[in-house]
Amino acid sequence: MKRIFRLFVLAMMATAVAVSCNDKEDYVEPTLDVTPNNIAGCWSLDSWSGGELSSCSYVYIDFVRADKTYTLYQNIDSQYMRAITGHYFIYTDDEKGAIIRGNYDYGNGDWSHRYVVTELTEGRMVWTALDNPADVSVYIRATLPSDLQ
């Protein structure tokens, strides 16, 4: 009887080890709520509407949680770096989810789109233009290069 019990315990342990070592399941990073706290910090535009940025182009956006401001560092529309500042606002739409919008300082108006923010993790977020679902931007967590500061 003891032998049968030992064999049963060994079989259960082997089953537990086999199940716990299953590498087929990929780790899925948990998503975060879209809040000023969770998006605070520096992000780099990784792709835009499915395409990569050219090797000499960049977009960094640095969100400040405390006063809901941002600084956008980019050279998309110029050969030189431009620093653009403003305020951002996050609200929740019952159907679409978290939406971010913003305006530019010095009376330069609002962002051209409002964006639905999805797939926010510690290191990545996806923005989709509310009025143009084909306009998709993927941002990754980044450190602002010292030459841009």
How should these model regions be labeled?
Residues 1-19:
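Sec-dependent bacterial lipoprotein signal peptides
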Residues 15-40, 146-149:
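Bacterial Sec-dependent N-terminal signal peptides
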Residues 34-54, 88-90:
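Tryptophan-anchored aromatic micro-motifs
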Residues 54-99:
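N-terminal glycine/threonine-rich, aromatic-flanked beta-hairpin/loop signature
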Residues 83-93, 128-149:
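Edge beta-strand at a domain terminus
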